[in-house]
C-alpha cells in the first residue's frame, strides 16, 4: 500500500508557497511539515525493523550454535607459562601467606 501522506503534504506545501507572500510563515509551515514527515518515516522504519528482528529471533541462529560448539571449557589457562612465577610469588610474598602476623615482603623493596 502506498502512503499518500507525503504526496498530500507536498501539494499543501506548494499551495502555501504560491498563496503565501510572507517567507517566514511559509518557512515555519514547511519546517513543521518536513519535521513531521521525517519523524513519521523514522518511526515506521524502526517499527519495521523491530518486526523483522522479532521474526528473526524465532528462527534458530546458526552463529550461536557454532559459537557454543567451538567454545573452550573454562579450565583452559592461556598464561600457563606464568604458573611457576605465580607459585613462587604465592610462597614468597605476603598475599600468599595465611599467617596474618608474618612479616610481609613488599614488592620492589631492596
Swiss-Prot record:
**Keyword Lipid biosynthesis on entry:** no
Induction cue: Expressed in the late phase of the viral replicative cycle.
Q: Which GO terms describe its cellular component?
A: membrane; virion membrane
Its subcellular locations are: Virion membrane
Q: Which residues cross the membrane?
A: 10-32
This protein's membrane topology, according to the annotation, is: Single-pass membrane protein
Task: Give the chief site where it resides.
Answer: virion
Assigned keywords, A-Z: Late protein, Membrane, Transmembrane, Transmembrane helix, Virion
Record has Methyltransferase as a keyword: no
State the family named in the UniProt similarity comment for this chain: Belongs to the asfivirus H108R family.
Name of the molecule in the record = Inner membrane protein H108R
Q: What organism is listed for this UniProt entry? A: African swine fever virus (isolate Pig/Kenya/KEN-50/1950)
